[in-house]
């Protein structure tokens, strides 16, 4: 869901590191972060181009990007475990409705995400990459996986992972070979 001004508050804890900092690590990845950001980017591009960008050209943009991001993680020697959001808590329904531009949402089923997760999971399976479904918030399961020692870090743009107990969070990951990423380490 995100916390207002979270990144400004924790900015002293953030350092920029090469993506190779992830090498050899097991990392829980919040899949919704990539799906939603790619879908938002396409919506902006289509809006700015006055819908001249055809839907066919952008329909599977998130799948294409997922492929290249996973490929980069694997090249770095990362063992990713992708985590999918489950049912949204009632507290989040108002926020989801606002993001979708609708008056209200009756359940936390996350139909939009589930529809886009299916082809992502097919791609991950074809690449031999593990994924799992959270019962509710993916960030919560990512943090739990780290706390239990199953993964070394979390890869997400959502600070909720820290609030759920993650102590090593990476964000701003790119498939580009020389890209830096942001690392936040926090002992709570």
Question: What does each model-identified segment do?
Answer:
Residues 89, 93-188:
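Extended two-metal-dependent nuclease catalytic cores across DNA- and RNA-processing enzymes
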């Amino acid at each position: 869901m995100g916390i207002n001004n979270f990144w400004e508050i924790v900015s002293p804890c953030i350092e920029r590191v090469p993506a190779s900092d992830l090498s050899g690590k097991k990392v829980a990845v919040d899949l919704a972060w990539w799906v939603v950001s790619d879908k938002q980017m396409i919506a902006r591009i289509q809006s700015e181009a006055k819908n001249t960008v055809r839907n066919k050209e952008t329909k599977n943009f998130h799948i294409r990007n997922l492929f290249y991001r996973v490929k980069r993680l694997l090249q770095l020697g990362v063992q990713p475990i992708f985590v999918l959001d489950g049912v949204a808590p009632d507290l989040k329904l108002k926020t989801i409705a606002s993001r979708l531009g609708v008056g209200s949402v009756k359940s936390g089923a996350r139909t939009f995400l589930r529809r886009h997760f299916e082809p992502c999971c097919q791609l991950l399976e074809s690449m031999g990459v593990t994924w799992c479904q959270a019962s509710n918030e993916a960030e919560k399961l990512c943090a739990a996986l780290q706390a239990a020692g199953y993964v070394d870090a979390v890869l997400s743009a959502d600070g909720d992972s820290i609030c759920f107990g993650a102590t090593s969070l990476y964000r701003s990951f790119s498939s580009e070979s020389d890209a830096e990423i942001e690392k936040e380490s926090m002992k709570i």
